[in-house]
């Protein structure tokens, strides 16, 4: 049999092992894995490289339409490809209008035409004003629904995203349970965080440490406990977003051990940055939940290696530089991290801390694909989409602003020495990023809809 592509001599991350083996591709799918596979139109030599499943980033904010000056599909998905991401799951907020019904998601599909370098699945929003329209988004094909129990959205903009109160969350979760959809939750206690933040501003406490103190660990833990219980009573599968504390992870682990259908994610910045570094970097490292102290970070590493965190995500949420100006308490909270997930975590988890390659593959790709039903993604296995990323181990470089593909070339990782490099990203058998050639093909990304899986 003749193939379109054979990748030879790379250390390939398979589901339960990593070994030097060849991978054959035909028609955009993985056709065979083994030795002496035969002929191909193209052969790539991956000697000395790790061949990983393309990352499935389950938490990405692209702000188009409506706020394309924050981030757009063209720049955001190019950055993703350069960072080894082949599939993103896009959040329903930051764009205007927020993705809360059929009409608003159709606007996103139109805005993205011809701009997607990678594939993209969609989340719908569960907000205070759309519980009677959740079925519309399910029918279109979203893979889950995001909500906030922390305060969010601009009250001066009618069609911006909104947080939900406990009643709205419960009613929404009941409906999503009936639809067979998971609810994804940003877990921080809204009232306590808001009041602590206002108190800090009144008293002139505006450092990074002050911001972290205004969103303490217990506000995350309390919110996780609350939504765990409400989702359980409502009969809805729960996914806890961007957990920042080991105590928060423990709540999820306990519920899972008791039989609840719950998963969780975290982000690289909670593992590689701490509060002192946040103080030094400034507002570019502001996010919520916040980056915490070194002791907290050590606890997060323990939870990650214990298998208590299901997947790692970017939570890429950039904004124009002027929104990061001024003191930390007033600046926009969101990190530009889409391009720096795979290489940073390969360096920190695999090279520095000894994580196995199969575990790395699960955290960066396989588990997210499974959680959100992306059946063709997340694995190097026959029949799956031929999505790969080539990683060059022990190849250090210093990230510069010019390296970035974002709409605004800023990131808290700029200036960081990263000990591994992404050299090639392949989507459905085609090279979409190469370290030497850049982006050699026109955007070929597609939207992934639930009912097409």
Swiss-Prot record:
Zn(2+) 2 binds at residues 146, 186, 242. Pathway: Nitrogen metabolism; (S)-allantoin degradation; allantoate from (S)-allantoin: step 1/1. It comes from Escherichia coli (strain SMS-3-5 / SECEC). Catalyzes the conversion of allantoin (5-ureidohydantoin) to allantoic acid by hydrolytic cleavage of the five-member hydantoin ring. Keywords: Hydrolase, Metal-binding, Purine metabolism, Zinc. GO terms for cellular component: cytoplasm. This is Allantoinase. Belongs to the metallo-dependent hydrolases superfamily. Allantoinase family. NCBIfam families: allantoinase (TIGR03178), PRK08044.1 (NF005960). Homotetramer. It catalyses: (S)-allantoin + H2O = allantoate + H(+). Zn(2+) 1 binds at residues 59, 61, 146, 315. GO terms for biological process: allantoin catabolic process; purine nucleobase catabolic process. It comes from the Bacteria. InterPro entries: Allantoinase, Allantoinase_bact, Amidohydro-rel, DHOase/Allantoinase_Hydrolase, Metal-dep_hydrolase_composite, Metal_Hydrolase. Binds 2 Zn(2+) ions per subunit. One of its GO terms (molecular function) is cobalt ion binding.
């Amino acid at each position: 049999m003749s193939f379109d592509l054979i990748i030879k001599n790379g250390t390939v991350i398979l589901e339960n092992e990593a070994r030097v083996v060849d991978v054959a591709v035909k028609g955009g799918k993985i056709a065979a894995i083994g030795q002496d596979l035969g002929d191909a139109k193209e052969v790539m030599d991956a000697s000395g490289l790790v061949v990983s499943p393309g990352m499935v980033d389950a938490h990405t904010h692209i702000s188009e339409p409506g706020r394309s000056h924050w981030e757009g599909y063209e720049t955001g998905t190019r950055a993703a490809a350069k960072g080894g991401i082949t599939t993103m799951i896009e959040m329903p907020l930051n764009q205007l209008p927020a993705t809360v019904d059929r009409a608003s998601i159709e606007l996103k599909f139109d805005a993205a035409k011809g701009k997607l370098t990678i594939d993209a699945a969609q989340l719908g929003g569960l907000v205070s004003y759309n519980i009677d329209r959740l079925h519309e988004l399910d029918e279109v094909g979203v893979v889950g629904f995001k909500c906030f129990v922390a305060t969010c959205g601009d009250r001066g903009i009618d069609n911006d995203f909104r947080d939900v109160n406990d009643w709205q969350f419960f009613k929404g979760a009941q409906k999503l349970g009936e639809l067979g959809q998971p609810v994804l939750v940003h877990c921080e206690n809204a009232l306590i965080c808001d009041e602590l933040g206002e108190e800090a501003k009144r008293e002139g406490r505006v450092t990074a440490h002050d911001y972290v103190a205004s969103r303490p660990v217990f506000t995350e833990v309390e919110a996780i406990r609350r939504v765990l219980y409400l989702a359980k009573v409502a009969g809805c599968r729960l996914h806890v977003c961007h957990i920042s504390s080991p105590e928060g992870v423990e709540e999820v682990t306990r519920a899972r051990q008791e039989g609840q259908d719950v998963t969780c994610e975290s982000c690289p910045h909670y593992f590689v940055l701490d509060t002192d570094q946040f103080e030094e970097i400034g507002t570019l490292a502001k996010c919520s939940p916040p980056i915490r102290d070194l002791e907290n970070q050590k606890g997060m590493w323990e939870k990650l290696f214990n298998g208590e965190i299901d997947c790692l995500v970017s939570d890429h949420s950039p904004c124009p530089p002027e929104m990061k100006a001024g003191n930390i308490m007033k600046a926009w909270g969101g990190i530009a991290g889409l391009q720096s997930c795979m290489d940073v975590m390969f360096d920190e988890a695999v090279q520095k801390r000894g994580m196995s390659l199969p575990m790395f593959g699960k955290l960066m790709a396989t588990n997210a694909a499974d959680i959100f039903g992306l059946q063709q993604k997340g694995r190097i296995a026959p029949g799956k989409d031929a999505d790969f990323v080539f990683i060059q181990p022990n190849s250090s470089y210093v990230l510069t602003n010019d390296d970035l593909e974002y709409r605004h070339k800023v990131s808290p990782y700029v200036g960081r020495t990263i000990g591994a490099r992404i050299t090639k990203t392949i989507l459905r058998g085609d090279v979409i990023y190469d370290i030497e050639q850049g982006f050699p093909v026109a955007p070929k990304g597609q939207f992934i809809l639930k009912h097409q899986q």
